[in-house]
């Protein structure tokens, strides 16, 4: 079992599932969400539109997961999750972000998926501080692997050098604390 930090385009990874940092409508947007929609092709939008709304305009509330096929991606599945919008860290943002990772891992285990790739959820337009988000991503994935066998391979995908460094710093900090 391993956690890997990888810098590049999440849509190019050959994994069982990629996690999409989506918005509540699941109809595509900017950042990684837009990149995934473009790479997966028009059938992804059709699949997302077919998902039921839980309230007007909302197909996936913050912290929850919705599943679609990967369509034109190498990944067989896409887990769409909505991370929190950063306000000040005092409105359950850390718990909501942690839940995005934990629920994705739980669903991957239930589906017996062996590899999963995460973007830096909430770190784009949602404004989550990068180092705090990286620490949560590393904590949740490490904690998961301590008590579960699947998925065996977790990839934390950095879209730029700053994110790559933040993930590595979070991993190093946890390794030092564990020693």
UniProtKB/Swiss-Prot annotation:
**Membrane-crossing residue ranges in chain numbering:** none
Alphabetized GO MF terms = O-acetyl-ADP-ribose deacetylase activity
Q: Which SUPFAM superfamilies match?
A: Macro domain-like
Which Pfam families does the protein's record reference?
Answer: Macro (PF01661)
Gene3D superfamilies listed in its UniProt record: Leucine Aminopeptidase, subunit E, domain 1 (3.40.220.10)
Name the InterPro entries on file.
Macro_dom, Macro_dom-like
Annotated Macro domain residues: 1-175
* Family per similarity comment: Belongs to the MacroD-type family.
Name-wise, this protein is Macro domain-containing protein XCC3184
Give the species this sequence originates from: Xanthomonas campestris pv. campestris (strain ATCC 33913 / DSM 3586 / NCPPB 528 / LMG 568 / P 25)
